[in-house]
């Protein structure tokens, strides 16, 4: 059985819904990430101690597997708060100069550490269920094959305002950070990164 990393032991004892911790150096993004596969929106408006909280706590989409048999992509949601907290600062990734200063994202699960490098960042939206015209980034969890993986990466790269020079190969581990954005109704801003280091790299 996998062992909980020492730094997570106390937090895990307090709340075993914790999946890990997300940090982007030089920003306010430094938060626990929750995972409740039976109730996707559980932490939408709850803090780590399960008390009501408007900003909620970042959480992993229930369709992802962040630990054993990890899905190619781990999709993490967080609120965009006017006060600047939670995932507000992700929107700055639209600007290449911000990207250049914040190329790496740290996402440690409770079992292993991981550093990710940003591939791209883009505006999108949540489309109607019957929409077939647009690519739905929020439905990509596991690629059936290389072509499906490459389609996701191509979508990310082609919708990013600058070329990060970073891409991903089929078999790489991805994280996708998603937050609300006001450019359109049901707008979203999305940052995608690939794992470059960790305990097993």
Over which residues does each language-model region extend?
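Solvent-exposed, non-transmembrane regions of membrane-associated and secreted proteins
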Residues: 1-201
